[in-house]
Design a protein with these regions (language model features):
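A contiguous, well-structured "functional interface" segment within a domain
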Residues: 212
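Concave beta-strand-loop units of leucine-rich repeat
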Residues: 1-11, 17-37, 42-118, 124-141, ...
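Intrinsically disordered, low-complexity repeat regions of secreted/extracellular protein precursors
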Residues: 164-167
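Substrate-binding/specificity loop regions of serine endopeptidase catalytic domains
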Residues: 145
Length: 283
């Protein structure tokens, strides 16, 4: 595996390459004209540099992992097949990423310690995973994405105030949401095609107001008693009509690290299932 560290002083060393494995761009940045022959990066392209505008070489069509971890004001990745677009680090609050309307790859947030960049295009994406976020009480909004043609997962984060998906309408794969922060807003989400695992402690009128169908099994936690009441005070699924598999209401839900199926915790405060009043069919 070849690793090329590209500063302006050594960029001519990779002018003749059409295919390389990993390309790390730091410090002074990248002159894409010097990479005009580049067609494929089989491994990872890492950008940790600043620029007002950066468009990847026109001949580059295939890229396995693209890591963006510092502020480029406008980053154009249109026309490139990328398996994973990963946002990490800080300095992305003023970044705009320009992509195709249908992005077939996966978007992941991994050790993101600043704001999520703005997106242009990206009406549909292949998958979306939100890992650890070091936002120290900040919020994250992903506004453009309307459809995820695969799985969505949000792993446990306790240092985030809110997660907002104002435009998301459909997830065709599995939907996994694990955390204990106070605001999750999916106001336009109507359909989940696969399984839904939802382990959250707070609901409000913007959490899942329009979720109508889950294609396979659905599990969510209702809260439990352990030296006081824990978990959600209210559960809200006002539009849920159909669950294609098993519907499981569990006092304490699973985590990314364990199932929590046989903990012995009980819910002694839930008095009715009025939050499922629109439900018409299960299984």
């Amino acid at each position: 595996m070849s690793i090329v560290n590209c500063h302006r002083s050594i960029i001519p060393l990779v002018e003749i390459h059409k295919k390389i494995e990993d390309l790390n761009v730091t410090l002074l940045g990248l002159d894409t004209e010097k990479l005009g022959a580049l067609e494929k990066i089989g491994g990872k392209l890492s950008l940790n540099c600043t620029a007002e505008y950066l468009k990847l070489p026109a001949g580059l069509k295939n890229l396995k992992v693209f890591v963006v971890s510092k502020g480029i004001e406008r980053l154009d990745i249109q026309g490139i097949e990328i398996e994973e677009l990963r946002f990490s680090g800080t300095g992305l609050e003023n970044t705009t990423v320009i992509g195709d309307d249908i992005f077939k790859g996966k978007i992941s947030l991994d050790n993101l310690s600043g704001y999520f960049p703005k997106l242009e295009g990206f009406r549909e994406v292949g998958k979306l995973n939100i890992g650890y976020l070091g936002l120290n009480g900040g919020s994250i909004e992903i506004g453009n994405i309307r459809k995820i043609n695969g799985d969505f997962s949000y792993w446990a984060n306790s240092n985030v105030k809110a997660v907002e998906f104002p435009a998301l309408e459909e997830v065709t794969g599995n939907f996994e949401l694990y955390s204990n922060i106070k605001e999750y807003h999916f106001p336009e989400l109507k359909s989940i095609g696969g399984k839904a695992i939802i382990r959250i402690d707070y609901y409000d009128e913007k959490t899942f107001p329009n979720l109508a169908t889950v294609g396979e099994d659905m599990m969510f936690q209702t809260g439990y008693d352990y030296y006081g009441s824990r978990g959600p005070a209210v559960v809200l699924y006002p539009a849920l009509k159909q669950v294609g598999g098993t519907l499981e209401l569990r006092p304490i839900g699973p985590t990314p690290w364990g199932d929590n199926e046989n903990t012995g915790y009980l819910n002694q405060t839930l008095e009715n299932l009025d939050f499922l009043s629109s439900l018409e069919k299960v299984g």
